Amino acid sequence: LHLCDRRQRQMCIRDRDKEIIFGDELTIDHIVWMGTQPTLKEKSERVGIRETLPSAAIISYLHKAVQKGQTVHYLPPYRPEHKLKLMDWLGIPPARQEGSVPFIRAVVAQRNYKSAEEIAEIEKACDVTADMHIKAMEVIRPGMYEYEVVAEMNRVAEMNNCELSFPTIATINGQTLHNHYHGNKIKSGDLFLIDAGAELPSGYCGDMSSTVPADKTFTSKQHAVYEIQNAMHLESVKALRPGIPYMEVYDLSARVMVEGLKGLGLMKGNADDAVREGAHALFYPHGLGHMMGLDVHDMENLGEVWVGYNGQPKSTQFGRKSQRLAIPLEPGFVHTVEPGIYFIPELIDMWKEGKKFTDFINSVSYTHLTLPTIA
């Protein structure tokens, strides 16, 4: 989609100074079921590629290139069927299909920098995404089921000719980071955590997180946690500028959370030390954000170490290792800012039993399982 603007099952090859699309024309059977379609040649010419060959010709083409000593560059395959094709074409077993680093870095160098036209598309996707979240806030009430709220959000996407950019998270059990179950009945006092986005026909994606009180207003306890999470978000946005490593913004958001939770009696000690040691991850076990574009986690299949770390190794520390973007921000980058505060019973129990970070976590933290998760 990025390299030749096509969604159809075709293969694009660049060989020195020429570009070729390998694919097959539709048969009458295809036309009966799919209707009249542009020919392969017409679709190729729309994106400036004039040479086309049948898909069956790709194997001999690649084999000849290898025999001539040419290096065949390819991106890491994301789908299982592509792994099988690469094994058929190049004889590389799926376990060894790591992709070509120079090709990966070249694509990342292109796609990390969004053009004005791309940014306009992402803004449209984010506008629809925001409307989806607002609709959830409008319709939610005790007695509804989660799937009823999700249906209203989906309707907003469909009414704007959009698909979902990823499977919607919409749940009263927000302590589970990736919870796609929507069968719970919403009760008075519940918080409804949403992580959802819209995808435009062009392929560009939106992604936002929000937390909605079922009763339309927060309880005092919920509001206290919300204010900390909101401060994490606002301080992170305020810190954004070209040149600042996004990992520094992550650390800032974590320090803001630690200071806030100290005010609630849940954490103690020096915030810088707590974040450096990783104590904050009891309540903040995920990253702050990621690149956005044609993928909601843009270029996820190319590897975070290249997209978000420019080849540098990632941290292995719990919480910090989930940060997808660490490199200095540059003009043209588009990324999310999604801090959260989570109270995960199983994680809290494990840390309590192991007496982890007692210099930073008050024992009272382990009795506050009723505190709300806010993202």
Task: Mark where each language-model region is.
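Short beta-strand segments
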Residues: 22-24, 74-76, 171, 195, ...
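Single conserved hydrophobic/aromatic residue that forms the stacking wall/gate
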Residues: 2-9, 13, 368, 373-375
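Active-site cores enriched in adjacent His and Asp/Glu residues with nearby glycine-rich loops
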Residues: 120-190, 196, 200-203, 238-306, ...
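Short acidic, glycine/serine/threonine-rich loops at helix termini
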Residues: 33-35, 84-87, 180-183, 204-208, ...
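Short acidic-glycine loop/turn motifs at beta-strand connectors
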Residues: 14-17, 173
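Flexible, acidic/His-enriched mid-domain "rim/lid" segments that flank
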Residues: 53-165, 173-179, 201, 214-217
